[in-house]
Amino acid sequence: MAEFKSKLNKGHAFTSKCASLVKEQRARLYILRRCATMLCCWYIQGDE
């Protein structure tokens, strides 16, 4: 039974680590998208 619990904890740690990495990447993409949108808006407004 102890082996099962240790495997379960390792699986949970892996899942938790993956979830945190996905969350970090989503935050980075969100920031990049906001910056790109802002730069495009400034570029378009500068033409007028």
UniProtKB/Swiss-Prot annotation:
Residues 13-44 are annotated as: Required for DVL/RTFL small polypeptide activity. InterPro entries: DVL, DVL_RTFL_regulatory. It is a single-pass membrane protein. Its main location: membrane. Belongs to the DVL/RTFL small polypeptides family. Small polypeptide acting as a regulatory molecule which coordinates cellular responses required for differentiation, growth and development, probably by restricting polar cell proliferation in lateral organs and coordinating socket cell recruitment and differentiation at trichome sites. This is Small polypeptide DEVIL 22. The lineage of its organism: Eukaryota, Viridiplantae, Streptophyta, Embryophyta, Tracheophyta.
